[in-house]
Amino acid sequence: MESPGLYTMVCIKDGEYIGTASFGRARIDNCSDSGEIISIYLLPEYIGKGYGIKIMDSVINELRIHEYKDVILYVLEENTRARKFYERYGFELCNDDKEVIIGGKKLTAVRYAIRDIQ
């Protein structure tokens, strides 16, 4: 699927959709040279089996093709499993948190970045 500046990729195993990622141009003004991973999901039974890395590799490669210099993403502060995955992949924590409201609850999302993916 594609809309201007936004792309969605799916991960399929044995004919079953097991994961997805959405990405594109960064949605914040001061990051015009950056791509953003908006979402990345994997069915729970496939977590820890290398599929997350395959999805991330594919997304980073697509962002390179679109000539983005850096990649950013936001993740909920309390999502320690995802944060550890991003850190192992090479993302670094930035000092740019934002408040989000999910289900009527205020939560903090923290920003991560990989610099110079080219």
Feature map (PLM): residue ranges:
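Short glycine-aromatic motifs
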Residues: 6, 90-91
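Residue-level detector of beta-propeller blades
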Residues: 17, 92-93
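C-terminal "cap" of GNAT-fold acetyltransferases
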Residues: 69-72, 76-83, 87-89, 95-118
